[in-house]
Amino acid sequence: MGCTLSAEDKAAVERSKMIDRNLREDGEKAAKEVKLLLLGAGESGKSTIVKQMKIIHEDGYSEDECKQYKVVVYSNTIQSIIAIIRAMGRLKIDFGEAARADDARQLFVLAGSAEEGVMTPELAGVIKRLWRDGGVQACFSRSREYQLNDSASYYLNDLDRISQSNYIPTQQDVLRTRVKTTGIVETHFTFKDLYFKMFDVGGQRSERKKWIHCFEGVTAIIFCVALSDYDLVLAEDEEMNRMHESMKLFDSICNNKWFTETSIILFLNKKDLFEEKIKRSPLTICYPEYTGSNTYEEAAAYIQCQFEDLNRRKDTKEIYTHFTCATDTKNVQFVFDAVTDVIIKNNLKECGLY
């Protein structure tokens, strides 16, 4: 006699099939979802990488979004010129022309309007005269001795354009803005049939305790290092060299037991600034034992080795290193394409398909 299923049994089989199908779909979805954690010390370029993802994968910033950055551009410009003027007092540098002392006093009186997104012709004139001054330029050339925004010269050299009443920030202006990241900023985008979730975590020391719950199930970590930080100290601790701080943090991330299976991608960032700086500021400031030349290639390769040598699992764990300029969209696009290929390859390995 043939075996027939009762209605109840049939329903159970259908339920089982549906569960299997859902599990398979969930598995496929999980395989296509990529969680990227952006880590690195403060001001290493993490937030700029996030902005680039919006430009490359999400059609960039709309005109309305760009307009909202106007106040940040003005604030960054004002903060930069004020930082230089204050440093002149500390470094005992005089103005090239005595009349600039009056401009400096005016700057502090007029600065408030820029914080509201307005750059008056009077304020723009004051900043232009100060920026052209020989003493101000001498102080700017010693910016490693105090804290100064990387984009200072970018904005100050372009005051004629950004002080126009009808000024709307460009994509590049937006990329150059500096706002301290607090907490966790999450960005989503699709690329090469993968769904990316990127988490940008505040880099300053006070923010690091908030990172912990981001770590679980992460596909890859992109660790950003500012190459140009080799001769700078931390904003939070003037005794600590920024590059040494980055190495300490990278060591703790790279060798963490939670990240045994996690791909570690190292972005040695701000290569453009490093290439300029290494000509006049020797690498021995950071690495006294360094005996190589102060050429970009040799000095950059030495820093790369310092970081890669921190990996205590060389036999089983590879560090994928890229030299980047986070403000250069084409460079970031090229590098991120290579990063995605590594992620796809590693995903296939886990599935036994590579």
Swiss-Prot record:
GO terms for cellular component: centriolar satellite; centrosome; ciliary basal body; cytoplasm; cytosol; extracellular exosome; Golgi apparatus; heterotrimeric G-protein complex. Residues 32-354 form the G-alpha domain. Keywords: ADP-ribosylation, Cell cycle, Cell division, Cell membrane, Cytoplasm, Cytoskeleton, Disease variant, GTP-binding, Lipoprotein, Magnesium, Membrane, Metal-binding, Myristate, Nucleotide-binding, Palmitate, Transducer. Residues 173-181 are annotated as: G2 motif. Residues 35-48 are annotated as: G1 motif. GTP binds at residues 42-48, 150-151, 175-181, 201, 203, 269-270, 272-273, 325-327. Changing I184A: No effect on binding to PLCD4. Mg(2+) binds at S47, T181. Residues 324-329 are annotated as: G5 motif. PANTHER family: GTP-BINDING PROTEIN ALPHA SUBUNIT, GUANINE NUCLEOTIDE-BINDING PROTEIN G(I) SUBUNIT ALPHA-3. Heterotrimeric G proteins are composed of 3 units; alpha, beta and gamma. The alpha subunit contains the guanine nucleotide binding site. GTP binding causes dissociation of the heterotrimer, liberating the individual subunits so that they can interact with downstream effector proteins. Forms a complex with CCDC88A/GIV and EGFR which leads to enhanced EGFR signaling and triggering of cell migration; ligand stimulation is required for recruitment of GNAI3 to the complex. Interacts (inactive GDP-bound form) with CCDC88A/GIV (via GBA motif); the interaction leads to activation of GNAI3. It is linked to Auriculocondylar syndrome 1: An autosomal dominant form of auriculocondylar syndrome, a craniofacial malformation syndrome characterized by variable mandibular anomalies, including mild to severe micrognathia, temporomandibular joint ankylosis, cleft palate, and a characteristic ear malformation that consists of separation of the lobule from the external ear, giving the appearance of a question mark (question-mark ear). Other frequently described features include prominent cheeks, cupped and posteriorly rotated ears, preauricular tags, and microstomia. Belongs to the G-alpha family. G(i/o/t/z) subfamily. This is Guanine nucleotide-binding protein G(i) subunit alpha-3. It comes from Homo sapiens (Human). The lineage of its organism: Eukaryota, Metazoa, Chordata, Craniata, Vertebrata. The gene is GNAI3.
